[in-house]
Amino acid sequence: MCTLLTSGSDFVWNSLRDFAGSTGIAGFFAEMGWGNVAMICVAFFLLYLAIRHKFEPLLLFTIAFGMLLTNLPDANLYHTELFEGGHVHWDIFVANAGLLDYLYLGVKLGIYPCLIFVGVGAMTDFGPLIANPKSFLLGAAAQIGIFTTFLGAYALGFTPAQAGSIGIIGGADGPTAIYLTSMLSPELLGPIAVAAYSYMALVPVIQPPIMRALTTKKERAIRMQTLRPVSKLERILFPIVITVIIALLLPSAAPLIGCLMLGNLMKECGVVDRLSKTVQNELMNIVVIFLGLTVGATATAEAFLNFRTLGILVLGVIAFGLGTAGGVLLAKFMNLFSKEGNKINPLIGSAGVSAVPMAARVSQVEGQKEDPGNYLLMHAMGPNVAGVVGSAVAAGILLSFLG
């Protein structure tokens, strides 16, 4: 009888021990268990920022939840080994892939960012840019942060591909940053995506001190002439002409620019309203969910918890600041050759980063601090949407040289 009880208790004890070892909780006591705990805390913090403070909630929310899922031990939703070396290992993919591995193919193959650009194009009004083509120059000047940070990151020991991925943070364009990084340095995708969207949310905090430091009260109070009306023909021709010119001169930028202008042409032509509304709403929302979850899934403890991530965060904010300064300084330079009454308020130069429409709103707010009756929003939207085009072109340039 005693032997029977002993064997029975041993069986129960062994069963409980085996069950405990098979749970995810046991994974927290493994070699990198502390890293999983740390990343789960980061995920909770990002969820807090997205929900409580509304920091880029549409993407930061899903990125944070993807980060949470991938760092739960033994969940087996995402496997970094399937994408090692920047390639999809199809020979072992089907047998080992989890849910997020399949969804990540949309990032790896460059599908999700391009689909988001279709939606962005359908929601973008290029009218202020068409009415004032000089805005193209301000949008281009704001991309200086991308290339200067690329050089700085390379000098600090990052590979050229990694440096290019870090530099693109300065464009303040999340989908472009994700697209370029997935092509050049997929191992940095998590930190770069978090940095890009965090700094986009912090536009009203980062930009104003730089704008005030580089301008005088008199410059901030400049009133600009009213923009001319833009005809429907101009609005229809613009996306077609831009697509042809950029795709011919820089083929590597064709996917992003082509999708951006496709969406805009849907909006402006007026004959495919159903398609335009679909890409603005249903398609955009679905892709944002998949993109955020899978980008967050790449933020594993091994990829995120290192000094390289800290360097990315620091270089990212420097890139963003340099882009802001570049636009403001070019506007001041252009004023040296502008007649009185036709000068540019330098504050709109900071909107050349492609955080639409937040950067343009910051220009408006800062301008009204000096002159409450000064309305810069529509003027700032020109450089702002030019920055969307500019960041895509910058990504194409980096991809053509580093890809």
PLM region spans:
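Alpha-helical transmembrane segments
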Residues: 187-205, 313-323, 346-351
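Alpha-helical membrane segments and immediately flanking helix-loop junctions
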Residues: 108-109, 117-123, 138-148, 152, ...
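Hydrophobic transmembrane alpha-helices of secondary-active transporters
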Residues: 46, 69, 104-130, 263-266, ...
